[in-house]
């Protein structure tokens, strides 16, 4: 229960623009639970917004290593790859998720975009 509260607190801090405090919250959560996919995903979002792409890739990858079908991390990782003009790298991951969840329109759209990438800076 404590970990859920810490995760929620971090998400509230982030939503209120207190990014550094949110980051500390998520990092402390990982000290208690190194398998918290949500914390890794949230840290990936923070790194992505800070334009620390290497760190963002690392965090999203760690989240997906814990749960390869974690939708939030898949969407965030795909958006990061799009911003780096490397969207085709997401195809295998998106195909797998799309096969398992045929009703997910956002994943289908991301997969279509990955197969027909447009430059990020158009």
State what each model feature region is:
Residues 15-16, 49-50, 83, 116-117:
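Register position in tetratricopeptide repeats
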């Amino acid at each position: 229960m404590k970990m859920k509260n810490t995760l929620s607190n971090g998400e509230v801090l982030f939503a209120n623009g207190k990014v550094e405090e949110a980051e500390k919250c998520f990092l402390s959560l990982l000290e208690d639970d190194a398998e918290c996919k949500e914390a890794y995903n949230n840290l990936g979002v923070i790194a992505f917004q800070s334009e620390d792409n290497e760190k963002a890739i690392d965090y999203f990858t760690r989240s997906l290593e814990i749960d390869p079908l974690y939708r939030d991390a898949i969407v965030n990782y795909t958006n990061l790859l799009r911003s780096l003009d490397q969207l085709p790298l997401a195809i295998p991951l998106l195909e797998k998720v799309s096969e398992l969840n045929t009703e997910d329109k956002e994943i289908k759209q991301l997969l279509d975009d990955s197969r027909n990438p447009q430059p990020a800076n158009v």
